[in-house]
């Protein structure tokens, strides 16, 4: 825990909760009559409102992207390596906005929050929201903050999908799009992994059809299994081999079916347990479905080039060589479509052994490329 914050940290930060009374029409045909969005901001908005950067989070992310909530906080925000003075998203230059998306479980309206119409927890009654719905809610957030146009919209993985959707839904409101370790839509294999994780959650006897909070229980076992499955896909075989190999946790093999004998088993159980204590099961189902549903080209005859013909932003795409969940080939699909649509695009494939989670890590070549692009953005 820091007693003095590093010079390149944004330091102590406080979340804000913004309430919206205007109904939000959703892709599903349902609507939210009112909702809350929790945000954090770093840096200062300039007089012309031209230096604003939106951070879009991935599946388990939230608004706390940088800095510390208290001097007792053990770890900084989830993208602290990239946000702060002198970092790729330099808060001396940019005004940075990070939020917890609708359907999340970190303060924004979602399954774990109170339904104002009933006075009870939403649970399974919270409507499905999509990437497009998130972008519409983020546009309202921009309006509330007095931001007509983002200097950049930035995100990795599911966050990259939101950044891409911004350029399609609101082309005139985005000058630069940074889409990192992402894809134009999920592959069948990716959807399959998400379905296995959902079934693990749904099969927990304490899930209770999504109304577990009313009964004062948590479907920890199912959520733990779901996270264990997901976490494997975020790491590369090389990274897991280097970190764990076949190292034993015990002194020797016990030759039974129940012992935790390998370090990798212990690690996965720890990750699953930790996740199950802080994340909402209904939110997990919603987030994985939002991933599955994302397919902006579907509305344009599955033609990604035609989908991107109307975008006005300049693009930066980055991928990682050992990411098999969102492989470099998926980023190149977007790059090729942008080139065919005659748009400005930069692309870097970074040699990194960490797999999909590399976009969250302080890899020198990644940070250098990230900084190089952000430094060229005029405000």
Curated annotation (Swiss-Prot):
Pathway: Amino-acid biosynthesis; L-methionine biosynthesis via de novo pathway; O-succinyl-L-homoserine from L-homoserine: step 1/1
Domain AB hydrolase-1: 51-360
Binding site for substrate: 227, 357
Keywords annotated in UniProt: Acyltransferase, Amino-acid biosynthesis, Cytoplasm, Methionine biosynthesis, Transferase
Species lineage: Bacteria, Pseudomonadati, Pseudomonadota, Gammaproteobacteria, Pseudomonadales
Localization terms from the record: Cytoplasm
GO BP, sorted A to Z: homoserine metabolic process; methionine biosynthetic process
Gene name of the record: metXS
Family: Belongs to the AB hydrolase superfamily. MetX family.
Pfam families: Abhydrolase_1
Domain of life: Bacteria
Class in the EC hierarchy, top level: transferase
Residues with site note (Important for acyl-CoA specificity): 325
Keyword Ligase part of the UniProt annotation: no
Gene Ontology molecular-function annotations: homoserine O-acetyltransferase activity; homoserine O-succinyltransferase activity
Gene Ontology CC: cytoplasm
Catalytic site: 157 (nucleophile), 323, 356
EC number of this enzyme: 2.3.1.46
Complex and partners: Homodimer.
Catalysed reactions, semicolon-separated: L-homoserine + succinyl-CoA = O-succinyl-L-homoserine + CoA
Protein task: Transfers a succinyl group from succinyl-CoA to L-homoserine, forming succinyl-L-homoserine.
Descriptive protein name: Homoserine O-succinyltransferase
